[in-house]
């Protein structure tokens, strides 16, 4: 793999071409998370509604949901990386998949039965994150679900430090070099803005969600479901 941590950015052509390989080495249980998100979708995706993926990257989640659920719904990805969107559309094998190049905080969701955000909102500043989640809530149909997967901070300093060290060990064990791990961490300083699990849930509550639960937790990665 030719991953170059010195030039890492979501919007580069290199990142788009190598994203799938890199993310599986960097995110614990990444394939399993996608599998569960697709299974949960089976409980919520309805005919003639919209399914949105915020930060759709190479479109794998959307394509997987479209192929597995076999429902007459529109599967819409939102991503501001032109190169990611090109990869997603090149691999799209269904007419009901659409990719939109736009910043999510400016996007209006409509007629949505299911909205997902997999490790995306953590890269958006807090004010825009709150705006996005509010837009998600308003765009969901009653009974629709929002799936949020995020890297989180520990609830106190000691737990945060322990979780970070465990996560660094995970990446090294998965084949990334020490230099890649360090340089990637340096490259996202000031860009990655994780919250704690409690803070994420409070943000969902502030947007209007009342039914909120955690369906996945590994070290400093969590999956949350919020139903309107």
Swiss-Prot record:
Record EC number: 2.1.3.-
Cited InterPro entries: CmoA (IPR005271), Methyltransf_25 (IPR041698), SAM-dependent_MTases_sf (IPR029063)
Signal peptide start and end residues: none
Keyword S-adenosyl-L-methionine: yes
Reactions catalysed: prephenate + S-adenosyl-L-methionine = carboxy-S-adenosyl-L-methionine + 3-phenylpyruvate + H2O
Keyword Chaperone attributed: no
Record's keyword terms, sorted: S-adenosyl-L-methionine, Transferase
SUPFAM superfamilies linked to this entry: S-adenosyl-L-methionine-dependent methyltransferases (SSF53335)
GO term, biological process aspect, one: tRNA wobble uridine modification
Residues annotated as binding S-adenosyl-L-methionine: 30, 55-57, 79-80, 103-104
Family: Belongs to the class I-like SAM-binding methyltransferase superfamily. Cx-SAM synthase family.
Purpose of the protein: Catalyzes the conversion of S-adenosyl-L-methionine (SAM) to carboxy-S-adenosyl-L-methionine (Cx-SAM).
Protein name, as recorded: Carboxy-S-adenosyl-L-methionine synthase
Organism of this sequence: Staphylococcus epidermidis (strain ATCC 35984 / DSM 28319 / BCRC 17069 / CCUG 31568 / BM 3577 / RP62A)
Recorded name of the encoding gene: cmoA
């Amino acid at each position: 793999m030719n991953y170059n941590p010195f030039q890492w950015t979501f919007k580069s052509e290199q990142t788009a071409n190598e994203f799938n390989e890199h993310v599986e080495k960097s995110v614990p249980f990444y394939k399993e998370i996608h599998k569960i998100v697709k299974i949960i979708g089976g409980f919520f995706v309805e005919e003639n509604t919209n399914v949105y993926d915020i930060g759709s990257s190479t479109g794998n989640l959307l394509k997987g949901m479209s192929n597995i659920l076999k429902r007459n719904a529109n599967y819409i990805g939102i991503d501001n990386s032109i190169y990611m969107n090109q990869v997603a559309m090149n691999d799209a094998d269904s007419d009901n998949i659409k990719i939109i190049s736009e910043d999510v905080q400016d996007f209006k969701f409509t007629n949505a039965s299911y909205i997902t955000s997999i490790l995306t909102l953590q890269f958006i500043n807090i004010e825009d994150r709150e705006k996005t989640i509010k837009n998600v809530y308003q765009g969901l149909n009653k009974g629709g679900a929002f799936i949020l997967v995020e890297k989180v901070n520990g609830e106190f300093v000691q737990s945060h430090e322990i979780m970070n060290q465990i996560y660094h060990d995970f990446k090294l064990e998965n084949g990334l070099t020490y230099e890649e791990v360090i340089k990637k961490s340096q490259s996202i300083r000031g860009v990655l803005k994780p919250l704690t699990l409690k803070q994420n849930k409070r943000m969902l509550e502030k947007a209007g969600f009342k039914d909120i639960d955690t369906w996945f937790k590994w070290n400093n990665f969590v999956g949350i479901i919020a139903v309107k």
